[in-house]
From Swiss-Prot:
It is found in: Nucleus. This is Protein HUA2-LIKE 3. Residues 1038-1049 have a biased composition (Acidic residues). Residues 110-137, 251-320, 383-402, 1037-1069, 1121-1140, 1147-1223, 1259-1347 are annotated as: Disordered. The gene is HULK3. Residues 390-402, 1054-1069, 1259-1272 have a biased composition (Basic and acidic residues). Probable transcription factor that acts with partial redundancy with HULK1 and HULK2. Plays diverse and essential roles in the control of plant development, physiology and flowering time. The lineage of its organism: Eukaryota, Viridiplantae, Streptophyta, Embryophyta, Tracheophyta. GO terms for biological process: flower development; mRNA processing. It holds the Pfam family CID. Residues 127-137, 1181-1191 have a biased composition (Polar residues). Expressed throughout young primordia, and vegetative and reproductive apices. The keyword Amino-acid biosynthesis does not apply. Disruption phenotype: No visible phenotype under normal growth conditions, but the triple mutant plants hulk1, hulk2 and hulk3 show delayed flowering. Residues 302-314 have a biased composition (Low complexity). It comes from Arabidopsis thaliana (Mouse-ear cress).
Length: 1347
């Protein structure tokens, strides 16, 4: 027999076969126990402080910040099939898994694109580029340019072209440019480097063009600059670029080497950075273009340090970032700047095609300014932008240096980088942030200044183009915003070529500030029609659009001047805003500003910082000034202050003006712009509002547009930068920062109390959200920077700040919408997320999580799965910093829920969240606990509303609170307080409820506690529920059946036996319930029939009569009738029934047998019938009342005495049939059951103690009956039997005429006064003043055994 194979050998073989050499960065699916195969990336264990293990694969999971060391068999490669599989089943796995799938899918697509870009085509290009001759480089450049032009034209003409092909073309072009640069570096060809720069620009713009195709119409002016929509524009653009490149080649600079080296590094980064790099690029590009969806594929901005996400960086757009890099690299000279710019553009590589599902609002305006900057950025702008570029490069470099977190999910990566960026290069961040915020007005002036300065410094070629394009964009945007746009539109449409010509003119008139301004106006006019209409229609809101455009203008102008410096562009927008304000207020102010900005462009960076600081400082004044010009300034203000309010907008304008006034001394570009602007603005500050109201329409409109353009730029990248570096910006800025912060805070306090809380960071976040809300929310890449800002907030646990930010941004959008309703409508239609985005200024992940949480609340049921899922979503929201919002949603849902049971379910969810939070460490655990503690009264009020129908809810909530008390979820004092409140609500009077209080709910000293099984109430009976039975016995006729058989065996029952039998029959029939009560009378057990005579008393009465008949063997009046008749006729009674009947009899016959020897004889004749006595209402009176009846009875008569009428003036009637003779037992029982009237009741009524036997009926009522007292004491008049004939009514003072019932009962009891109807069957031996009733044995007729 072959040896059995070792179990598990197959597994080992599979593992060994699956083992492979994983490389760092490989995308895999890693299986960990308890989790599905999770998307992950192979990582280096050394990076995490672990040693390498060949048996384990170190993976870093997407969607989390966790790593694991998995066996080779648990790791499988991520393929296209796996991707499809994950996409189909990701939704049921939780938000983390969905995010992980999304991230790995994006990374996978990016890697595919990179592979395509680095394929054989790239190798060929590299080989061709590496040819030894430098002279080949220009030709190659020309070829590339031609091919790129063709490609651009083709792409513009065929929008449906495969996106992957476009990506590959762009990537190949970029690689070619890199190779060309490399060759040039080897051959030291300056012209070649210039050509490479142009090629890079072409490649970048071509990819951008594709990205912008969707929004090309919006950016007609920009499309002129960049080949986006029309082949003509593209061709012109390319030709212009070629010309510039040729000029640059002639100017040729030796900086190509450095550029090439950087290009090589960047290219390497592009290939190795992985998803984070691509994401960063995408985010920057998205910021530039406004949305990933529209761009299907994004250009990856591969800066030396910007590979990763451009979070804290001032990368509002890919082109802008590129320029800042280029400037940083080529700031040594104009040629270097151009080359660096080109190189940076070449580093731009399309990474991936974004999912259209990612909803992002595209700010097309942003892209054109960036493109304009890219084209127009000339070497001239290099010097002026160096400072800001350096800071910007540092910002960009920071993410690259921090690439170690590329494996993290977008949100978490953004959080990490935000934290790093927050502490690193705070000055740079602050500058960029401030620039972005205050760059609205400054942007126009900065653009004008930058372009002239670029022209002067760098040369007519690229410098003019850049300045012209920038100015053109600024004017275009301004015109778009203003009504002048209409005028400009026809000219723009008519002269598409004029677009380029204005730039040429601008180049020619490099030194002419007015020429540049005019050029900008011309360009604006030319492009106004397409760009204004499309941009406005596509912008989220008019104000948002204006803001976006203003930042774009800032980017275009400032980027031209600062090129690679997002900070500069941000700062420039501030200056531009100031100049625009001046322009709006004063027409001549624009040219002056342009001149000053052009002259002072070199100081752009520092000026930006100054301007940034100054803007806040000036905000109060400007705010006042701009209140009048809210429509124009509101656009600018929104971008600057980020507050999202018209007041803030005004404040921003004021800030711009003031900042200019404060900053005239600094020589930097901003200060230069501010210099003349300050002079003009200072003058205009007083007249600003007047001029704003009545300033030249075109200029004001242009200013508005410029401001709007600036705002969009801020929304894309500046907003992100602001969010990340809002606080550092103020710190970074000069001493003005403090003033700016203070001013900003003051403005916030005036404008919004919430803004006070958020302060600078809040403002920056608001701006980014306001301008790029849709973009950031919709685009994953852009979302990352936004997430960074948001994450920072969440990391700081400023949930209120986030909410305030969203509120502000919403306000900003609303304010902007108010200023431009039409634009707002278009914006809303464009915004896919719509109301959700307006309500939530958070990342798309946070928004999705909030929506999922709301859905989970709607579908919540009392199951572990649904409550656990909602709890996990709540924990996710706490990670995002919106736990307060989650609790508010939960409380609102709880309050609005109409189903009481679902309210308990929701409160159980609160319990789940609280317990889950208790298990968390750090601040995350205390967030929800503090919220729950604060909202607990509200939650309990909603879960347990007032009313008797919420007892179940109250019990469940008490259980939860006691559990919290036991586990110390919340402070003990608070929990106990709420428990006491709920307990007090539980102690509702019993009268409100139909049921009797449970045994455990009664007081310890309550005698009824011991009688739980007897079904009696505080008054000795349970007749409360069957009160009608006394008056209408037929109702219980059927129920009484079976009780008549109680007359069978009359076996005397001891208290122990009786109680035991009663316990065995806890639920006797209704009649029995009413007929027996146990009362405690002086420690003795006494039976008393308290039930209505006709319903419950029928059976008991039969037994009683039988017993009485036994006792009354010597019945004088009715000798013929004996208990034997009854006994024989009636079936034997069950022991329990007998016991109960005996009890009732003992109660009814509660006479002091000690005084009645005959009764004693009866008692001894049979076993004593005793039950555990039970107080009937007030026990003493009831017992005394019973005993009182016997006071007038002769003792010596024994049973005969019992049957004798009670001594009274009216002796009982002689006829035995009427008096004491029993009817035939059947008849007797039947008559009693049927409640037949007894004609001779009156006979007994007179002799019996005539305390209304209705009182005994009354005893059945809930309130304590004092009729028992009447039983003891004879009332002066008799009102008839206590239990009257059912047919005759409850109160009959006539004779007790039920000879059936009465005869049997009165044979034993012989009362002249009719006893209680049901008591008649029991022999009542009353003594006048017996001290208490005594149990009576009714088995032995005629004898009482006295104790």
């Amino acid at each position: 027999m072959a040896p059995s194979r070792k179990r598990g050998g197959g597994r080992a073989a599979a593992a060994s076969s699956a083992r492979r050499e994983w490389k760092v960065g490989d995308l895999v699916l890693a299986k960990v126990k308890g989790f599905p195969a999770w998307p992950a990336v192979v990582d280096e264990p050394e990076k995490w402080g672990h040693s390498a293990d060949s048996k384990k694969v170190t993976v870093h999971f997407f969607g989390t910040q966790q790593i694991a060391f998995c066996n080779h068999g648990d790791v499988e490669s991520f393929t296209e099939e796996k991707k499809q599989s994950l996409l189909t089943r990701r939704h049921a796995k939780g938000s983390d898994f969905v995010r992980a799938v999304k991230e790995i899918t994006e990374s996978y697509e990016k890697l595919k694109q990179q592979d395509q870009a680095s394929g054989p085509k790239y190798a060929e290009e590299t080989t061709a580029g590496s040819s030894g001759n430098t002279s080949q480089l220009p030709q190659a450049c020309e070829n590339l340019i031609g091919s790129r032009l063709d490609t651009q034209i083709e792409s513009s003409s065929s929008h449906g072209r495969d996106e992957l092909t476009l990506l590959s073309e762009d990537a190949s072009a970029a690689e070619q440019m890199l190779a060309l640069r490399h060759n040039t570096l080897a051959h030291n060809g300056a012209c070649d480097s210039a050509a490479a720069k142009d090629l890079c620009e072409i490649a970048t713009y071509s990819s951008r063009r594709r990205n912008e195709r969707v929004r090309a119409l919006k950016y007609a002016p920009q499309s002129i600059i960049l080949p986006v929509e029309h082949s003509k524009i593209s061709s012109r653009l390319e030709l212009d670029r070629v010309q510039r490149s040729m000029l640059q080649c002639s100017d040729g600079g030796p900086s190509v080497n450095s550029i090439n080296g950087k290009a090589i590094r960047r290219r390497k980064r592009i290939r190795t950075s992985g998803q984070s790099e691509s994401d960063d690029v995408v985010s920057s590009d998205l910021n530039l273009h406004g949305s990933d969806e529209d761009n299907a594929s994004e250009i990856a901005t591969v800066e030396s340090n910007n590979n990763s996400r451009n979070e804290g960086n001032g990368v509002d757009s890919g082109s802008k970032v590129e320029y800042s890099d280029a400037v940083g690299e080529g700031c040594d000279g104009g040629h270097e700047l151009n080359k660096g710019l080109d190189f940076h553009i070449s580093t731009m590589v399309k990474r991936k095609k974004r999912k259209p599902t990612r909803k992002r609002e595209t700010s097309d305006i942003i892209d054109p300014p960036a493109k304009v900057e890219a084209e127009g950025l000339g070497p001239n702008a290099c010097d002026s932008c160096q400072r800001s570029q350096n800071s910007h490069e540092r910002l960009n470099e920071r993410p690259c240096e921090e690439n170690g977190d590329e494996h993290l999910p977008l949100v978490k990566r953004a959080r990490v980088r935000m934290s790093r960026a927050f502490y690193a290069d705070e000055k740079v961040n602050a500058s960029s942030q401030v620039e972005e915020r205050s760059s609205k007005d400054t942007l126009l002036s900065a653009a004008l200044q930058t372009s002239p300065s670029v022209n002067h410094e760098n040369g007519i070629g690229s410098g003019h183009d850049t300045s012209a394009a920038e100015e053109f964009n600024s004017f275009e945007l301004s015109a778009k915003l203003s009504g002048v746009m209409v005028d400009v539109v026809p000219s723009h449409m008519e002269k598409p070529s004029d677009r380029m010509s204005p730039s040429v003119a601008c180049v020619q008139t490099v030194g002419d500030r007015q020429t540049a301004v005019n050029f900008h106006e011309n360009e604006f006019t030319m492009t106004l029609d397409d760009e204004v209409t499309r941009a406005q229609s596509n912008q989220l809101s008019s104000l948002v659009e204006t803001e976006a455009r203003v930042p774009e203008v800032v980017q275009g102008c400032s980027e031209e001047s600062q090129t690679g410096n997002c900070l500069i562009s941000e700062t420039d927008p501030i200056d531009i805003q100031c100049s625009h304000q001046s322009e709006k207020h004063e027409t001549p102010l624009n040219p002056d500003i342009v001149d000053s900005s052009a002259n002072k462009s070199p100081g752009l960076c520092s000026s930006l910082d100054m301007t940034t600081t100054v803007v806040p400082a000036q905000s109060p004044h400007q705010h006042k000034i701009q209140e009048y010009d809210s429509s124009d300034h509101s656009l600018v203000i929104v971008g600057d202050s980020l507050n999202g309010k018209c007041e803030k907008i005004d404040y921003c304008m004021t800030q711009v003006v003031q900042s200019q006034a404060l900053e005239p001394p600094p020589p930097l570009f901003c200060s230069v712009v501010n210099y003349q602007e300050v002079e003009n603005l200072q003058e205009t500050e007083n007249t600003l509002w007047k001029e704003n109201q009545g300033s030249p329409g075109k200029e004001l409109d242009s200013d508005k547009q410029a401001h709007m353009i600036q705002n969009p730029v801020l929304s894309a990248t500046e907003s992100e930068m602001i969010v990340d570096d809002a606080e550092p910006q103020y710190e970074t800025v000069y001493s003005h920062c403090a003033d700016a912060v203070e001013n900003r805070e003051l403005e916030k306090s005036c404008e919004v109390d919430e803004q006070k809380e958020q302060m600078q960071a809040t403002n920056s976040i608001s701006v980014s959200e306001n301008f790029s809300r849709e973009k950031l929310n919709s685009s994953p890449a852009r979302g990352t920077p936004n997430c960074n800002s948001v994450c920072r907030i969440s990391t700081a646990e400023s949930e209120n700040a986030m909410q305030n930010n969203s509120y502000y941004s919403t306000n900003v959008q609303y304010g902007e919408n108010k200023s431009l309703n039409v634009d707002t409508v278009k914006e809303e239609s464009k915004v896919e997320t719509g109301t959700t985005q307006v309500k939530k200024v958070v990342s798309s992940d946070v928004q999705c999580t909030v929506e999922s949480f709301e859905t989970a609340l709607d579908s919540l049921v009392r199951t572990k799965e649904t409550i656990g899922r909602a709890t996990r979503l709540a924990m996710d929201l706490a990670k995002f910093g919106v736990s307060a919002k989650a609790m508010e949603i939960l409380a609102h849902t709880l309050e609005s829920e109409s189903n009481l049971q679902r309210r308990v379910d929701l409160f159980f969810l609160v319990d789940s969240i609280a317990q889950c939070s208790k298990g968390l460490n750090g601040d995350a655990g205390g967030v929800y606990l503090s919220s729950i503690q604060a909202m607990l009264p509200r939650l309990l009020t909603a879960a347990v509303p007032a009313g008797a129908t919420t007892q179940e809810n109250r019990k469940q909530c008490l259980k939860v609170l006691r559990l919290w008390l036991e586990r110390r979820i919340l402070p003990e004092s608070i929990v106990r307080h709420h428990i006491r409140e709920l307990d007090s609500l539980s102690n509702v009077p019993a009268c409100l409820y139909s049921r009797r209080s449970a045994r455990t709910e009664r007081a310890l000293d309550d005698p009824v506690r011991d009688m739980e099984g007897i079904l009696v109430d505080e008054y000795g009976s349970n007749s409360t529920l069957q009160l009608h039975g006394f008056c209408i016995p037929p109702i219980l006729r059927d129920e009484d059946e079976g009780s008549d058989s109680d007359g069978g065996d009359f076996e005397s029952v001891t208290p122990e036996h009786e109680s035991r039998s009663l316990e065995e029959h806890v639920t006797p029939s209704i009649t029995e319930r009413h007929t027996r009560i146990l009362e405690d009378v002086d420690g003795e057990l006494e039976m008393e029939d308290v039930a209505p005579p006709w319903e419950g008393g029928s059976s008991a009465s039969a037994i009683t009569d039988q017993a009485d008949n036994r006792e009354s063997a010597n019945c004088l009046l009715v000798p013929g009738t004996s208990h034997q008749n009854v006994t024989s006729s009636s079936p034997p009674a069950r022991p329990s029934q007998n016991a109960q009947l005996a009890m009732s009899n003992s109660y009814s016959n509660g006479f002091d047998y000690r005084r009645n020897p005959s009764m004693q004889g009866d008692y001894h004749a049979g076993p004593p019938r005793m039950n555990p006595p039970m107080h009937y209402g007030s026990p003493e009176p009831s017992y005394s009342s019973r005993v009182s009846l016997s006071k007038s009875m002769p003792r010596g008569e024994g049973s005969n005495f019992q049957h004798r009428p009670y001594p009274s003036s009216h002796p009982p009637p002689p006829p035995p049939s009427h008096h004491y003779s029993y009817m035939e037992p059947d008849h007797h029982i039947k008559s009693r059951r049927e409640g037949l009237s007894y004609p001779h009741r009156s006979h007994y009524t007179l002799e019996f103690d005539e305390r209304n036997y209705q009182d005994s009926y009354e005893r059945m009522r809930p309130e304590p009956c004092e009729n028992r007292d009447n039983w003891r004491y004879h009332p002066p008049s008799s009102h008839g039997p206590r239990y009257h004939d059912r047919h005759k009514g409850p109160h009959q003072s006539s004779s007790y005429s039920g000879h059936h019932r009465d005869s049997g009962r009165l044979q034993n009891n012989r009362w002249s006064d009719s006893p209680r109807a049901y008591n008649n069957r029991h022999s009542y031996h009353y003594k006048q003043h017996s001290e208490g009733p005594v149990p009576v044995g009714m088995r032995d007729p005629g004898t009482w055994h006295q104790r």
